[in-house]
Amino acid sequence: MNEGLAEKEKWFSRSDNNLALYMGNHVGFLGAICELTDVPGILKWDCLKTDWHAQPAYPTSMIYNPHATNQAVSLSLNAPSDIYDSVSGQFIAKAQQTTYQLTLESDQVVVLVAVPAGAGLQKQGSHLTANGIVIDFNSNTPLDTL
């Protein structure tokens, strides 16, 4: 038993390698990227918050419904937006103003991109862009069906 205490003292007594200082810092990251919604148990995750080397991007959020029933979640928008779901590869709403009412089926996850309303869409290989900014890196949907 003393052997374990000696090992513990070896690792945690010096401030230059005190791992205890760093063991909980990941909780701060989770708090920074997570936001409550108006439905208990459904969280909105900011997919761009910790991407420090990101290319230009539109607001992107992941939302998952863990409930056994369909749920309606209200989402606030910063500007008029077309809502693109990169999981389904489709726009699920067009020309939304300040709030969008999202209906999620049970166990459904969406990754939503708030694209400026009426943005010009282009395909560049598998990339789908809106006004030159990538909104889907692996789009299989033909441009004329969006």
Residues of each region from the PLM?
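Residue-level "contact hotspot" at macromolecular interaction interfaces
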Residues: 101-103
